[in-house]
Amino acid sequence: SAASDVYKRQGFSIVLVKDISLLDGCKIGHFNFIKCPCLKMSESAMIGNLNFIRGNFSLELREESMIYMQNKITSSGYSFHDVTFVLGKYASIQVAHLFDVTDNIKIGDNTLFAGVGTQVWTHSFYLEDSGKGRHRIDGSVSIGNNVNISSRCIICCGVKIADSIIIGANSCISKDLKSKGLYVNQELRFIEFDPAEKMSSMICQKSIGKLNIYKK
């Protein structure tokens, strides 16, 4: 049966999924917690051990991709469209990385999250100049093919990274990377920034009490 077939491919893990598809050779290891509406794993895809995956998003692992160990993939409580986390063919997420899937995350083929401790964010907040006002900004993250991301990087909301890029350790990526090559962090510098002006070009998706949620 389909249930027994899934059981043969799963170690000692908790998997709470409404729609699940596991193709030949894929595997879920031990001590994972997975709770999401949809899980699709293509041929020889793997979820290793001790991963925590929970949220209102669909998870798709393409051929021979891997989420290895101790990674955390979650979403915030509110999303306003169908959200998907896609891991491309032969792509690999190694150890103890964090992904916020409030909006879509797409990771290209043969892309590597190396080392430990990288964070990928698909939402952020703008605070008003005074008072209690704060506004959530959602933005999908797209990472191309053959991208190598080193330990403890931060990839911010709405960023797009082109193919064949290397990102050095401890880098903060707050804007699109369009040309292939090596990127490393720079010295701290001041940038003029007005949240109100920035939000004026965005669409407010919803207001919850005093919190307005915008789409980047």
Q: What is each stretch, according to the model?
A:
Residues 120-121, 168, 174-175, 191-193:
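Conserved acidic donor-binding loop of glycosyltransferase catalytic domains
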Residues 1-7:
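Short, small-residue-biased leader/transition segments that mark boundaries at the very start
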Residues 8-16:
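Extracellular beta-sheet-rich ligand-binding/adhesion modules
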Residues 179-202:
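Conserved beta-strand-loop-alpha-helix hinge in the C-terminal portion
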Residues 197-216:
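Charged, low-complexity C-terminal accessory regions
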Residues 4, 63, 109, 172-173:
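Short linear motifs in intrinsically disordered
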Residues 161-184:
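C-terminal/domain-terminus segments
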Residues 17-22, 26-159, 187, 194-195:
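Flexible, glycine/small-residue-enriched loop-and-beta-strand segment within the central core
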